[in-house]
Amino acid sequence: MPRVGLIVNDGKELAVKTAKTFQKKLEDSGFEVVRVSSAGGLLGFTNPDQYMSSQGYNSCIPEGFDSSILFAVVLGGDGTVLSAARQTAPLGIPILTVNTGHLGFLAEAYLSDIDKIFKHLVARQWSIEKRTSLVVSVMRGDQCRWEALCLNEMALHREPMTSMCHFEISVGRHAPVDISADGVILSTPTGSTAYSLSAGGPVITPDCPVLQLTPVSPHSLASRALVFSNEEPVTVFPATPERLMMVVDGSAGCYVWPEDRVLIRKSDHPVKFIRLSDHEFFQVLRNKLGWGLPHVAKPDKT
């Protein structure tokens, strides 16, 4: 009997209710279902007064999940998808994202598509789209103090009521750059429509093999977003006396001290999205973010 995963946002009543329907339909279709909570993919925030420990990003893999899982259905919003990515990517498990949240930018299907979903799943008619993910590591000397996998971005910024930050950033073998700003964002193409977009960064189509560095409120007219190859590792050195906050995928992360450095590199484990139909990125931008909509009504051609 093929094994499949069901990752649910247990904090949302609609997701929990929908999970019961999905589990029954999957079992009736001949699948063994391993149901887990998306909370297992949440990172949490480390205590700034205690020494951080790193269990590696594999620690987010749920109990009962292994490489024999054919696919996992994810029920929730975009935050749930980001958590599920950390739970599945290390094992190479494809995810089918079903929106029970709000915007659903990362959703492939909706609750109104249930019949269509099961028709494709039972017939195993789908394609896989691979999205770049990142490994983010906080290093002190040769020791890794904290590590996580992320799909969208890593944001490193000042705490409230502290002064502007200074960063020295090295991209691959290029000359290091100095940035003075409230923070910096290192994002994937998937993350280019998230925090980076709000900070003035460009939208990047998901198939581009690049990463993006975006300053947050920089104190320079010359400081702008930079796009570069995703084969280039990035090192961020905090050049400021105060501790900084690092947030991964908008949910949680850790504190970074002046003696630490942050390493970011492309992960060997892309996030695999199941596509039931052609995924047209520009149409998603139009529908979800209003990109490319006409500002005036077009004349009737009839």
UniProtKB/Swiss-Prot annotation:
Name of the protein in question: NAD kinase 2
Similarity comment: family membership: Belongs to the NAD kinase family.
Catalytic activity: NAD(+) + ATP = ADP + NADP(+) + H(+)
The EC number(s) this enzyme carries: 2.7.1.23
Free-text function comment from the UniProt entry: Involved in the regulation of the intracellular balance of NAD and NADP, and is a key enzyme in the biosynthesis of NADP. Catalyzes specifically the phosphorylation on 2'-hydroxyl of the adenosine moiety of NAD to yield NADP.
InterPro entries found in the cross-reference section: ATP-NAD_kinase_N (IPR017438), ATP-NAD_kinase_PpnK-typ_C (IPR017437), NAD/diacylglycerol_kinase_sf (IPR016064), NADK (IPR002504)
A GO cellular component annotation in the UniProt record: cytoplasm
NCBIfam families: PRK02649.1
Intracellular or extracellular location(s): Cytoplasm
Major subcellular site: cytoplasm
Named cofactor requirement(s): a divalent metal cation
GO BP annotations listed: NAD metabolic process; NADP biosynthetic process
